[in-house]
């Protein structure tokens, strides 16, 4: 056995967007304050950065929309850390594994070199808060569990997904792994002889209906994951729904 077990609170894809309110981040901060986890993992895509969407019409940088995207990301983080800092308690270790939306600024600057240095990932504000930031697709091992926005497979580097995504994570990576990205939840425990592994796709933390997603909105799991007694890649999983957090902390 390794070191003593720890508790990890996972913030799934939360997509702060200027057209929708950020109250859910205050609820998350209050819950985290009461829970007192050893580690908080933001699995990525806290920032939506809709102004830099590469999937719609050709992107033209509109300064006001870009600033609004950055500001709403900053506001989301401020709401979380305002609650965590109440009573001047020691903060948990705070980890952010950057997602594909979080890195849209740098992708846009790479495609438009004249803006190199003027438009950058740091604009979403993670440097203003005590995050331990990991680059997009770089995993971090915490108590034997890998955390990454999404894991890839094959020569094309496609996200591991599908109907049995958690099981595929275990088979492809041979390690307990937690990912986000798909906004759905899937969970698998493999207790095969000689190994014990756990795979988790952790859903979303979005309380609005995303216009681009259509009927897929109804498939999204909305809440947070609590990994209790994490040690050597194993843990006890708890799921706290977003409606429950709103009922308890939204007053």
What are the roles of these predicted feature ranges?
Residues 1-78:
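N-terminal active-site segment of His-dependent metallophosphoesterases
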Residues 26-28, 57-60, 112-115, 193-197:
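Glycine-rich, phosphate-binding/catalytic loops in enzymes
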Residues 72-178, 182-193:
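Conserved catalytic scaffold of divalent metal-dependent phosphoesterases
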Residues 148-240, 244:
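Conserved beta-sheet core of the metallophosphoesterase superfamily
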Residues 12-16, 44-47, 100-102, 150-152, ...:
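Active-site metal-binding loops of divalent metal-dependent hydrolases
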Residues 40, 94-96, 199:
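Hydrophobic/aromatic residues located in beta-strands of well-ordered beta-sheets
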Residues 249-250:
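Intrinsically disordered, low-complexity segments enriched in small/polar residues
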Residues 5, 36-38, 91-93, 173-174, ...:
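A general structural motif
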């Amino acid at each position: 056995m390794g070191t003593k077990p720890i508790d990890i609170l996972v913030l799934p894809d939360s997509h702060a967007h200027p057209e929708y309110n950020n109250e859910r981040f205050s609820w998350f901060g209050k819950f985290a304050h009461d829970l007192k986890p050893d580690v908080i993992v933001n699995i990525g895509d806290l920032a939506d950065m809709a102004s830099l969407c590469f999937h719609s019409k050709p992107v033209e940088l509109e300064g006001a929309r870009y600033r609004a995207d950055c500001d709403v990301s900053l506001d989301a983080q401020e709401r979380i850390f305002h609650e965590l800092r109440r009573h001047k308690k020691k903060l948990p270790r705070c980890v952010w594994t950057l997602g594909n939306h979080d890195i849209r600024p740098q992708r846009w600057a790479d495609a438009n070199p004249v803006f190199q240095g003027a438009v950058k990932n740091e604009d979403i504000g993670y440097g203003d808060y005590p995050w331990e930031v990991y680059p997009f697709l770089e995993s971090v091992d915490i108590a034997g569990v890998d955390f990454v926005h999404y894991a890839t497979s094959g020569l094309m580097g496609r996200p591991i997904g599908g109907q049995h995504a958690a099981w595929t994570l275990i088979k492809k990576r041979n390690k307990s792994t937690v990912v986000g990205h798909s906004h759905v939840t899937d969970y698998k425990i493999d207790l095969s002889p000689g190994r014990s592994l756990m795979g988790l796709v952790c859903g979303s933390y979005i309380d609005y209906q995303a216009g681009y997603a259509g009927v897929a909105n109804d498939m999204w799991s909305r809440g947070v994951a609590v990994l209790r007694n994490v040690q050597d890649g194993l843990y006890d999983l708890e799921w706290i729904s977003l409606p429950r957090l709103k009922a308890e902390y939204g007053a």
